[in-house]
Amino acid sequence: MDDDGGGSPGHYGGGGIHLVCEYCGHGSEYAEDDADDGFFTCRQCSAIHTSTQNTATNPFDFPMTPAHLSAHRRPTQPTPTPKPFPAPRGAATGAAAPDFDDLGEPSEPRDFATGANAWGNPEDVAARVRWRYVRGLQVILQRQLEALVERHRVGSLAASLAGTIWLRWVAASKVFDEMWVHKMLAIAASVEEGHSASKDKQSELEGDAQKSQSSYEFLFLRSLRMMLPVYSTLAVCFLACHVARETILPTDICRWAMEGKLPYVAAFTQVDKLLGSSLNDCPLSSRQLFRPTRVIGAWQLEAAAGSIAQKIGLLLPSVNFYLIAQRFLKELSLPIEKILPHACRIYEWAMPAELWLSSNPGRVPSRVCVMAILIVALRVLYGINGQGIWESIAQTENAVGSDPEASAPHSIEPDSNNSEEFDARELLCTLAASYDKINVGHDYSKEVHSYLKYCKDVVFTGMTFSLEEEHLIDIFWDMYKGKEVMLLDENAKLCQEKLRTTNGVNKRCRDGRFADTKCCSTPLGNCALQSIKSKMEENGFCYVSPRKRLVSDGYLLYTRRESSGSLIYVAHADYYILLRPFAKLAEVDVRVLHSSVLKLERRLGWIEERVGRSLNTLQNLHDEASDDERPVSD
């Protein structure tokens, strides 16, 4: 607004202003409201007057200090000419206002990244990164133990043991060694010397300082991840469960970590909630520090647990064979009261070294050894030594035809003359049914909806989206839900049509004509036998026909046969049916379990041979002693 007294307009935006365009030469009067984002536009050519900007500031919003007294003075008398703008505060010769640094405020905006020199020298950066990394791993371990106790029914003893193991593991890793920083700086210096030799002098600018700072940070992080890997929290959890005699297996830990039921992949989001933002005390974000590249496998996890126990000097017991074997038998629907006592005798007699954790990643896991003991116990109890039990089951199914009730595995009538054969037949039928029921897949892979939710909550957690991206996501979700409903309706219609056309009249044979199911179906026994042969070939096994007669009462040791330039395993069908569900439950290859069974049987045969020799020696000593005590006749 204009001054009624004819004084000059205030410098903070009052009154009008006359501007002349630099391009077209047109001059015009502009008011305060004519500015667009602080700039005035020519009314003739629409050019922007860059020389003048409307700041719309009020001098009364600032404190009246001696340095500001000359900034504005309310005009009380008309003056012929306006006073010039005051000089900047930095150029004032008088007492200047205090800087922002003196008021305790940061010199840089908080919304922007910190400068290269904000974290101090490399020693301070190393200390900050190391302290944040170790504390963050401890928070992740704490969350994992809480999930094990609350969701997976692990005892509190395992949680208390994990704390002690973790502290000893951190101490053994020497992550807080005073010489660690100097070693890392020496490595970084040698790397920089190699790079500086290939650069010219003009490249050594201020931007190189920030690059050097970043290289230091990631060098420290790489070293910390080698000494204390992120997956070491999972290894400590499994090791604590092992010492506490829990039935938790490495496969359970890996599956829960992959599915998000155990905080691991997305655990870095919980670190900031407990420790605060990492930007306050560490140049690296929590995602860079604790985001794992992949989930470790079960074999590597067990080897990592054994390595930690070896480094901290922890004497480990063997696996809890009784509870783990009981769990496996229960999942396979096998009689626990009959099988478990015999398996425990073999365990106490043989005591194989594979039942203890090892730091060797190439050794057979301990759960495979437990499975091998159970398989040997089943072979001894039920006499599964290649007598053709599965072939007899296939012939029985072929005889009963296509009647589903008569061909069911559990509908076989027992033979009163040979109850052991019936037990073996029922065992193989139960194992064949249990093999199809075992589900080793992840929960998120069951359907697309659960997989998308898994990706949102676990894989891409911590990522932010714009409003437009969120709107597109909502649109795609609505499209997916609509198509999903349509697919469900179509599947329901197809199921109803199949039920109508599979009653024995409208079923189409391969030649294109409709006939009864019996006229075009192959014998069920031949189908079952051909199916098991093809599956054996896929898994590296060769089918062997049943044995006609037993050569000996010892263990049946299978050898390997050369086929197409490679060695493959040979086995009978009944033994393969016994082997297959145990391997699937242990999540290992069938050949690995087969090799473990052969190794255990050789060990048992060697022990039995040594025991027999010892008994014979004792008997001979007893006979010699009795001969010496016998009186000599005249």
Swiss-Prot record:
Keyword Lipid biosynthesis among record annotations: no
Note on domains (UniProt): Although it shares weak sequence similarity with GTF2B/TFIIB, displays a similar subdomain organization as GTF2B/TFIIB, with a N-terminal zinc finger, a connecting region (composed of B-reader and B-linker regions), followed by 2 cyclin folds.
Sorted UniProt keywords: DNA-binding, Metal-binding, Nucleus, Transcription, Transcription regulation, Zinc, Zinc-finger
Residue stretches of biased makeup (Pro residues): 77-87
GO cellular component terms, A-Z: RNA polymerase I core factor complex
Function: Component of RNA polymerase I core factor complex that acts as a GTF2B/TFIIB-like factor and plays a key role in multiple steps during transcription initiation such as pre-initiation complex (PIC) assembly and postpolymerase recruitment events in polymerase I (Pol I) transcription. Binds rDNA promoters and plays a role in Pol I recruitment.
The protein, known as: TATA box-binding protein-associated factor RNA polymerase I subunit B
B-reader, as annotated region: 51-80
GO biological process: nucleolar large rRNA transcription by RNA polymerase I; RNA polymerase I preinitiation complex assembly
InterPro entries tied to this protein: Rrn7_cyclin_C, Rrn7_cyclin_N, TAF1B/Rrn7
Molecular function in Gene Ontology: RNA polymerase I core promoter sequence-specific DNA binding; zinc ion binding
Annotated region described as N-terminal cyclin fold, given as residue ranges: 84-281
Family, as annotated: Belongs to the RRN7/TAF1B family.
Highest rank taxon of the organism: Eukaryota
Region spans: C-terminal cyclin fold: 282-284
